[in-house]
Amino acid sequence: MPQLELISWFFNFLLAWFFLFIVVTILLKINFPSTNYITVTHPQKLNIFNNWLWT
């Protein structure tokens, strides 16, 4: 059954991307104070987010 093989490959592909996304998100949360990505794009939103975060 080649169709079943394709489905299992697609599932493994999705699982790998999902795992990669989780790892990247965790790394970004660990390195959040040292990254200037959000500061460059949305300074006002970052200030609102920081105020909400520290209250």
From Swiss-Prot:
Protein family according to the UniProt entry: Belongs to the ATPase protein 8 family.
Localization per Swiss-Prot or TrEMBL: Mitochondrion membrane
Function: Mitochondrial membrane ATP synthase (F(1)F(0) ATP synthase or Complex V) produces ATP from ADP in the presence of a proton gradient across the membrane which is generated by electron transport complexes of the respiratory chain. F-type ATPases consist of two structural domains, F(1) - containing the extramembraneous catalytic core and F(0) - containing the membrane proton channel, linked together by a central stalk and a peripheral stalk. During catalysis, ATP synthesis in the catalytic domain of F(1) is coupled via a rotary mechanism of the central stalk subunits to proton translocation.
Bilayer topology annotation: Single-pass membrane protein
Keywords: ATP synthesis, CF(0), Hydrogen ion transport, Ion transport, Membrane, Mitochondrion, Transmembrane, Transmembrane helix, Transport
Assigned GO CC terms: mitochondrial membrane; proton-transporting ATP synthase complex
Origin superkingdom: Eukaryota
Subunit structure: F-type ATPases have 2 components, CF(1) - the catalytic core - and CF(0) - the membrane proton channel.
Membrane-spanning ranges: 7-28
GO biological process, one term: ATP biosynthetic process
Major localization listed first in the record, in broad terms: mitochondrion
Protein name stated in the entry: ATP synthase protein 8
